Amino acid sequence: MYLAYMEKSMHASKTPFSSKIKIFLDGADRGSMVEMASNPLIQGFTTNPSLMRKAGVKDYEAFCKEILTQIKGKPISFEVFADEFGEMKRQAMKIAGWDTGAKNVYVKIPIVNSKGESSIPLIRELSHQGVQLNVTALYTFQQVLETAQAVKGGARSIVSVFAGRISDTGRDPVPMMQASLEVCRSMDSNIELLWASCREAWNIVQADVMGCHIITAPADMIKKVASFNRDLNEVTLDTVKTFKTDSELAGFSL
């Protein structure tokens, strides 16, 4: 067994990452967003209320409008935070109105509200009124299917499946992501599948290999793409050097 692995590793040491997938930055730190906007690897941005709170955002509208003046020409998603569908619609229309003609603003709508009530009727209505949506917090194939059916024939839409959080439950998200991709492709060319809640750099490779349209990841995860195909012996040496440096800085003795 180990001989077969050694033979394989000698001839297949490269990552299968092809760079075809669109990589979005997931976060709400203004500095990181502006810095990453000039990075050709980054093709879009996603935010949510939790990330904004973590980043210390106090004025939702002011933050979003300022970001839009600094990040132009790349898709960016802002999420509604209302829980009642009437108010959710009002917020969605307001957010969509921040688009100045670049067609880069996407409104994030959760698949259900906090009461577990389906957002599908609102999703269908908004999409067919021309609002570009990022339907978020999807975990099941049924949710993906219903969403794709709702936005079919509507405005451009992103379907965000939280693959990382699915894996946190002990389930392999890849089969569901593959089935979801087939549905999105067959339903409408305006629908893109997004791999959300990236847990490790390898997820970027997984999503790319399977043909997923988009993956969103935090800045620290995206920076690891630069390490793809690094010589593993170099990684070993760097690791041991770090151990040595930290033990010296800590002043350890035996």
What are these regions, as identified by a protein language model?
Residues 18-34, 38-42, 46-125:
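Active-site beta->alpha loop and helix N-cap motifs at the rims of alpha/beta catalytic domains
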